[in-house]
């Protein structure tokens, strides 16, 4: 991000989570949130395209959208831009399922507990408190390892 847009990102801790929606035996996932200041340039779609290029460089091969959840080497998502609602064929912000995913909200709350993904919406902390996801989200590596 610093290379692409000249901004130094903040990074959450990494969190270990069960392989959500995957066949038994699929290794756990590592999740992390990265946050940076956005000055309205580039456009959100340009940011998303850059993230897709990074995925590709790291060995991800994308499959059809209707294939369901599949294990992958890397998955980068543009989750939200504080106070921005964005709906285009390519990108929806905030991420339409962000509020349902503890593995997203816990690391996000670590960095930006009080931001609102939509202008009048709940804070990240409030979304986390109301999140229906009961899956295990553990700090990685676990303390004491």
Regions found by a protein language model. Give the residues of each.
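Short, surface-exposed acidic-centric catalytic microdomains
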Residues: 1-43, 48
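Flexible, gly/pro- and Lys/Arg-enriched active-site loops
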Residues: 20-24, 28-29, 45-145
